[in-house]
Amino acid sequence: MSVNPDVAGRSYPPAPPFQVGREAVRGFAEAVQAQHPAHHDVAAARALGHADLVAPPTFAVVIAQRAEAAVVADPELGIDFSRVVHADERFVHHRPLVAGDEVVATVRVEAVKSLGGNRMVTTVTEIADLDGAAVSTV
């Protein structure tokens, strides 16, 4: 089955709330070799004015992928995940993600384009706090 271009513009329900945990921040920082003390040491993060550990900027993808699972699983879109090639990713951070944050991610299919006999699917995931304030766009 090929990717259905008519799904462009579709939004999906929010993923369940995600609690940003200290150990998740530390583990991710270690995995991506982010050495800044604010990712590992609460006192260092607080000295910079943050309430707790600051997640590395790319940590937002952990949250975004939970929402993007709905896109991959959508039978109307028709994605064969075994044929997916990741081409591009951009982050816009409205504020840092900090341990203790509880956030919700909502994804939409921004576009479905033909490219070299294949389809390119562009998604946008909005991450917000529980009050609806923007945190990151992936």
Where are the language model's segments positioned?
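Hot-dog-fold acyl-thioester-processing enzymes
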Residues: M1-H86
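HotDog/MaoC-like acyl-thioester-processing domains
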Residues: M1-D6, H86-D88, V92-V138
